[in-house]
Every structure is written in C-alpha cells, then in structure tokens.
A protein has these predicted regions:
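Active-site anion/phosphate-binding pocket segments in diverse small-molecule metabolic enzymes
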Residues: 1-156
Length: 156
C-alpha cells in the first residue's frame, strides 16, 4: 500500500509543523527570512537571511541619497515605506522609487559617500528573489564566491 504524502505549512506555521516529522514542510521564507516576517513573527527567532547590496550613486540634494535599488532589484508591491529596510541608517524616509533608483531622505546623508555600499533588507523576499538569477552567499559574515541559482527567475 502507498502512503499518502502530506505537504503542509508555510513560513508562519513552520515552528508548529516542524515537530510533526511524518509530514513534509513547504515553507519558503524560512530559507531567506525577510524583514516583513521578522516584524510579524519575532517569536520564531529567525535571523534576516536576505540582504540586498546597494550603493549610493548620487546625492541629488541636501539630505537626499539616490541608491541603485529600483523596482528591478527589490519588490515594489508594498507601499514605499515598506519595501526595504536599511539597518545602517538611523533615520530615513523613502521618497521615490523608479525602475533603477530609490531615493531616500536622510538627515545624516553627510555620513555617506557616493559609491558607498549599503545593505538593505527586503520587506518581501518572494517577489524580490525572483528578480535575480542567483543569490550570492555570505557565510560567517564573509562574502563568498559561492552562489545559489534562483530557479524561479527563469521557469517556463
């Protein structure tokens, strides 16, 4: 006789279903935990595992930084203030985003140089990861030459 396979659980219910070893889990976000679930489920105690590397490409005005993090790089389905979080910037407001650029208002903009790299945590990793063909791996806080192919990018 064939035993039926039960596939359960998304990321929010991962902790509940993880204890039921006879069932297969199907969470996606636990692999690349994002800012959104970090805010919604702090009790799950996962670290944010999806980081976006961006850089300051210009300073178009006083207190403004223009980053190369447009909606070709980070999912744009959320309101501006809920698309990406910058842990290295104490106070900022996202004021616009286009295909290629994201502009933030930042009172501490003098601290940042053109060309400087910044890390952004995506609010929602699922549509963000599909924008990229691979994910580079950071292991023990070191950037490596290893990467994962993002198969959702080119599926038929």
């Amino acid at each position: 006789s064939t035993k039926d396979e039960v596939i359960v659980g998304g990321s929010p219910t991962f902790a509940l279903w993880a204890e039921l070893s006879e069932w297969n889990l199907s969470p996606g976000t636990v692999t690349l935990w994002d800012q959104g679930y970090s805010n919604l489920f702090p009790d799950l105690n996962f670290e944010i595992a999806a980081h976006l590397l961006t850089r300051v490409i210009s300073k178009p005005n006083k207190n403004l930084l223009c980053l190369d993090l447009g909606h070709k790089s980070v999912a744009a389905e959320n309101p501006l203030e809920k698309r990406v979080y910058f842990p290295e910037i104490e106070t900022y407001k996202i004021i616009s985003q286009s295909e290629e650029h994201l502009v933030i208002e930042c009172p501490e903009s003098d601290k940042f140089e053109i060309g400087q790299h910044l890390i952004g945590y995506p609010q929602h990793i699922c549509p963000t990861v599909a924008l990229h063909s691979k994910a580079n791996l950071i292991i023990n806080n070191n950037i490596t030459s290893k990467s994962w192919e993002v198969t959702s990018r080119n599926r038929v």
